[in-house]
Amino acid sequence: MIRIENALPTQAAIIATLIMEAMNHECCQYFAGPRHTTADFHRLMKSLVERTDSQYSYTNTLVALDGTEVVGCCVSYDGARLHRLRQAFIAGAQAAFGMDHSDMDDETRAGELYIDSLAVAASHRGQGIATSLLEATCRKARRMNLPAGLLVDQGNPAAERLYSRLGFEYVNDAEWGSHPMRHLQRKV
């Protein structure tokens, strides 16, 4: 039986791994830069999950548990907090990799609970876990009286179909990291 719970800092390593799966390898390597590896990037992400002032914080994360094993996660936060929460990532990448990511595009804004990262372990896909994580996150959005918003890769129609089936609707085209995306929202 899969349970959805608030994340704990002790789950940071697996949450970081799952977030990196959601980002994809090329994106992670871009953020780490040419002189560093995705293992280096994982160390940074783990440290960001362990913090409370990061967009990737465990405090912003729901996990799917199969027994005690984390098999999925969904990271979300109030879009109004993006710039403040992103500072930990910017400072961390600068310190760890000498990379300046302070000019990143904004993927969200005030007025929505932004679903930053959603991932399910390969061994547990196809069991409705992503749907359960999204439904729990949408309940969080409802409690905050905000629509839930996300960006979906224009090259991932299967993900967009899942979001549409769950009530997410197209808002506008977007770009993130020079990548064409679609901004979707689910109203409260």
Residues of each region from the PLM?
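Conserved N-terminal entry element of GNAT/NAT acetyltransferase domains
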Residues: M1-T10, C28-Y30
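Conserved GNAT-fold acetyl-CoA-binding loop/helix
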Residues: E26-V49, N60, Q94-A95
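A short helix-loop-beta-strand connector motif used in the catalytic cores of GNAT acetyltransferases and
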Residues: E50-V63, A80-R84, Y114
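Conserved beta-strand in the GNAT
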Residues: V63, E69-D78, Y114, A119
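Conserved acyl-donor/pantetheine-binding loop and adjacent beta-alpha core of acyl/acetyltransferases
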Residues: D78-S117
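Conserved catalytic-core motifs of GNAT/GCN5-like acyltransferases
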Residues: G79-R81, G149-V152, S164-H183
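Conserved GNAT acetyl-CoA-binding A-motif
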Residues: E112-L113, R125, A141-D153
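Conserved acetyl-CoA-binding loop-helix of GNAT-fold acetyltransferases
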Residues: G126-R139, R161-R165
